[in-house]
Amino acid sequence: MVTIRLARGGAKKRPFYQVVVTDSRNARDGRFIERVGFFNPIASGQAEALRLDLDRINHWVELGATVSDRVSALIKEAKKAA
């Protein structure tokens, strides 16, 4: 099953997440089909905290991809900010 979820990057104590479309059987930070955005939970000042390609996310959801709970909340936040 294809899912849209977060893949963790960054350093210890300084997380940075990529929003990726991947097969649910792949490892959290493993192979992915497409990168559709990023989320920086510790962004401050002028740093961009969230960027999502909503067109591509909608495309994958129409094809049957499931969305993780956290990514669903981020999509809601991005739509509110737009």
Curated annotation (Swiss-Prot):
Keywords: Ribonucleoprotein, Ribosomal protein
GO function terms (MF aspect): structural constituent of ribosome
The organism's place on the tree of life at top rank: Bacteria
InterPro entries: Ribosomal_bS16, Ribosomal_bS16_CS, Ribosomal_bS16_dom_sf
Gene Ontology biological-process entries: translation
Gene Ontology CC terms, in alphabetical order: cytoplasm; small ribosomal subunit
Family: Belongs to the bacterial ribosomal protein bS16 family.
Name this polypeptide is given: Small ribosomal subunit protein bS16
